[in-house]
A protein has these predicted regions:
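Flexible gly/pro-rich beta->alpha loop and the following alpha-helix that scaffold active-site loops
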Residues: 26-32, 36-102, 106-107, 113, ...
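Short, Lys/Arg-enriched N-terminal segments with co-localized hydrophobic residues
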Residues: 12-21
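Pocket-forming structural segment of enzyme catalytic cores
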Residues: 86-102, 107-202, 206-210
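Active-site proximal loop and beta-alpha junction motif in alpha/beta enzyme cores
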Residues: 24-27, 188
């Protein structure tokens, strides 16, 4: 997408959602690369939505991060369910900004806050159907209760941390999504950045809105 299109897209967002005031500068939401094959798609999706975004390796020192309005922890080949390790993601989760974990990032988030991820009894690769629970929370706002998503994982979250709730489930994976809305922590087992996820763009739009609201709320004051 060309720069002019990105500017138009940002203007469209401001028109569609008045709470999005990008006149004083774009939101800054970076993507931590945990080795996932689709990390660049997450970056491209954010750019498409008018966000100032960069891809950073997961060994980036937390003090070298920019002043961020939000952060995405990408998926990756790391077996978080076996090792419990994922670069410097533990330090990133200490930041007082909204964070979205995708696949391995989601699994690591669960373990960091006291939940558990382990090897999945039924690994998923390809399209799957998920069902939202109680509307799915703010990350799924404006999407239907049943939707198709793209899966690619050997491990899965089996216990959510205290303070989190399950927001989406499927027949083969109980915890397809989780959130702690008070802490602005969101996890997705599936890959919303892949075209096969029907409402992936809407999910990214919702995360951008969450970051905007956090910036205007107590966190950003």
């Amino acid at each position: 997408m060309q720069p002019n299109s990105l500017i138009k897209r940002a203007s469209f967002i401001t028109l569609l959602w008045p709470e999005f005031d990008m006149s004083d500068g774009r939101l800054v939401i970076d993507v931590i690369d945990n080795g996932g094959q689709w990390t660049h798609r997450e970056w491209r999706m954010l750019r498409y939505l008018g966000v100032d975004t960069k891809i950073l390796p997961n060994n980036t020192a937390v003090e070298n991060l920019r002043e961020l309005d939000g952060l995405i922890l990408s998926g990756g080949a790391a077996r978080v369910g076996l090792t419990g390790e994922l670069g410097n993601c533990a330090e990133y989760l200490e930041l007082n900004i909204p964070i979205l974990g995708i696949c391995a990032g989601h699994q690591f988030m669960a373990g960091f806050y006291g939940g558990q991820a382990r090897e999945a009894p039924a690994p998923e690769f390809g399209a799957a159907t998920i069902n939202l629970i109680d509307g799915g929370g703010p990350l799924f706002a404006g999407t239907p209760d049943t939707q198709t998503v793209w899966e690619s994982h050997n491990d899965e979250v089996v216990i959510i941390p205290d303070g989190f709730v399950i927001t989406a489930s499927s027949n083969s994976c109980e915890i397809q999504a989780m959130e702690n809305e008070k802490q602005d922590r969101f996890g997705l087992q599936f890959h919303p950045e892949v075209n096969d996820s029907e409402y992936g763009e809407k999910i990214f739009e919702n995360f951008v809105k969450i970051c905007e609201r956090a910036l205007k709320g107590p966190r950003g004051q």
